[in-house]
Amino acid sequence: MKKFSLIVAVCANGGIGIKGDLPWRLRQELKYFSRMTKKIQDSGKRNAIIMGRKTYFGVPESKRPLPERLNIILTRDPSANAYPSEVMVCTSMQEALKKLDEAPLVNEIENVWIVGGNAVYKEAMQSDRCHRIYLTEIKETFECDAFFPEITSDFQLVKNDDDVPEDIQEENGIQYQYRIYEKVPK
């Protein structure tokens, strides 16, 4: 059973989105998201990203599905929207994880990333398979209508990976910092 990690950018008021979009424009932070969710050790494999329907359709049409990763969309009504053949549509997180544990995907996927939105993050954080949260802490408040769930004491802040900068980043006058939380084994 593969563990998974979450990746998210959160502003000072806990916000992660507004009207299906990001409230900020941080090109380097988006590059970090792309690099982290594509990073593999085995060149014969790729990563999977799991997201809710609204998160998927929040990605500009020209950029979806997100390249070089298996895009898995969670939706209660798979027939309500048309999806490209290269994405996998599941009705639950449980179904998606089950498919990732079975052939052929178990041999093709290296890492699994949860990329939003709120309900998907919340369910993922409660799972025993949740390993880490890669959180970009944006040091400013933005108007948001979607929020990241509270990080409970089940998670502790850990040292950043070698390829994750520890110092404060700044872009377009907005400061942010990369943090990693790891789930404490029970």
Curated annotation (Swiss-Prot):
Reaction(s) this enzyme catalyzes, per UniProt: (6S)-5,6,7,8-tetrahydrofolate + NADP(+) = 7,8-dihydrofolate + NADPH + H(+)
Lineage: Eukaryota, Metazoa, Ecdysozoa, Arthropoda, Hexapoda
Organism of derivation: Aedes albopictus
Family matches, as InterPro entries: DHFR, DHFR-like_dom_sf, DHFR_CS, DHFR_dom
Pathway given in the UniProt record: Cofactor biosynthesis; tetrahydrofolate biosynthesis; 5,6,7,8-tetrahydrofolate from 7,8-dihydrofolate: step 1/1
Keyword field contains NADP: yes
Family named by the database record: Belongs to the dihydrofolate reductase family.
E.C. no: 1.5.1.3
Annotated residues for binding of NADP(+): 9, 15-21, 53-55, 75-77, 116-123
Protein name, entry field: Dihydrofolate reductase
Alphabetical list of Pfam families matching this protein: DHFR_1 (PF00186)
Keyword Oxidoreductase: yes
